[in-house]
Amino acid sequence: MPWAADCWRILRVSLPQYFWLTCSLHKIKKMISFLTENIKMPHLDRKAVRAWIAAVAATYDGRKVGNLNYIFCNDDRILEVNKEFLGHDYYTDIITFDYSEPGVVSGDMYISLDTVLSNSSKFHTSMDKELMRVIIHGVLHLCGLNDKGRGERAVMEAAENRALDMWYKKQY
């Protein structure tokens, strides 16, 4: 189980029920965290990225941002996560674990910077643009979009392009 979900499960079991009622009655600051495993942190304007993510999520029925953890890693780590949790034996750019509740997007997103780099070359785009596409791709999954079924990939790509347009026009 990804680390945030495991911590959440432990807290849920170990803290008294009144604590959770109190939390639900008061605004608790939600977080978007950027973490690394076995790789150097990419340069990001974290404040701008957080605002952009919140703006994109809000375009999907006014969804709010809960707790989002971006875990940047290498290909070896993402392959390990892919095998362990999804039973897939291949590299990918992002794996999203969804812990969302109605109206609030929350989750862990593992991003392989190695795959992002190779995809940027493959798709003739910059590393920065490809990274932003992958970052928002995870949020779009948390907002309910899929990319595996017939026609879903085109819908996802259009949503990514709208979100990237917001990013580059600073409309967030």
What is each model feature region?
Residues P2, D6-L131, C143-Y172:
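An acidic/histidine-cluster motif and surrounding catalytic segment
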Residues I136, L140-G144:
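Short active-site segment of divalent metal-dependent hydrolases/proteases
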